[in-house]
Regions:
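Short secondary-structure junction motifs
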Residues: 1, 55-57, 180
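Conserved short alpha-helical segments that host acidic/polar catalytic motifs at enzyme active sites
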Residues: 1-9
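Short histidine-centered catalytic/ligand-binding loop motif
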Residues: 27-39
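Rossmann-like S-adenosyl-L-methionine
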Residues: 88-205
Length: 205
């Protein structure tokens, strides 16, 4: 419950609204005008319910930096939602644990809401087939697939992303889990790298 999707749009009868929980931070993305005009009510109720259940929530960060909002006359924006009862929430960074692996999550700059929660079981599957293998993780983002492969016994994992910040985050997450001798983040264009590897007969992958 510390790391999960709390509201999943139409499936939960909130069309255009996604709310993810990452430890002590909620992250919301509002894509419909109908939800936008009611978000203050919804967010405050959600916060109240969680607090009444004894959950520690530092704040709610809005990730509305998506162009689809323009189609409904809404502006792109991101930042902390102002709860009346909460103190200054601080940095939009937190730590989560999934499949026994710890991650730093940047809810301000990470893709989507900061972490791809829907890939949890795919990451588990990777861990089961990675033992002894040399693994190439493309579009690594936070290094989640790479770290699960390493935790599953991979001999070596190269985690590639065009973002230098993503590669650095992967290295930091690997170090946090004692997997830095196995996982290495690499800043590179995946498509260029794959073309090079096709012609590299000595490649390990």
């Amino acid at each position: 419950f510390k790391c999960c999707r709390l509201i999943f749009g139409e499936a939960d009868h909130f069309p255009g609204l996604t709310v993810d929980r990452f430890n002590d931070i909620l992250v919301a993305q509002t894509l419909s005008l109908g939800i936008e005009v009611r978000k203050e009510l919804i967010f405050n109720l959600l916060y109240k319910i969680l607090r009444e259940q004894g959950e520690e929530i530092r704040g709610l960060y809005e990730r509305n930096d998506v162009k689809i909002r323009l189609l409904e006359g809404m502006e792109e924006n991101k930042g902390w939602f102002a709860f009346a009862e909460t103190a200054e929430p601080g940095e939009p960074l937190t730590e989560i644990v999934e499949n026994g692996i710890k991650y730093n999550v940047d809810v301000e700059n990470g893709q989507k809401t900061g972490f791809f929660l829907d890939q949890k079981y795919n990451r588990q599957a990777i861990a089961k087939i990675a033992r002894g293998k040399h693994v190439l993780d493309c579009f690594t983002h936070t290094g989640a697939f790479a770290l699960n492969a390493a935790a599953g016994g991979a001999a070596a994992v190269t985690a590639v992303d065009i973002s230098a910040e993503a590669a650095q985050m992967t290295d930091a997450n690997a170090s946090k889990n004692g997997l830095d001798k196995v996982v290495k983040g690499l800043k590179a264009n995946v498509f260029d790298l794959l073309s090079e590897l096709v012609n590299n007969k000595s490649r390990e992958f």
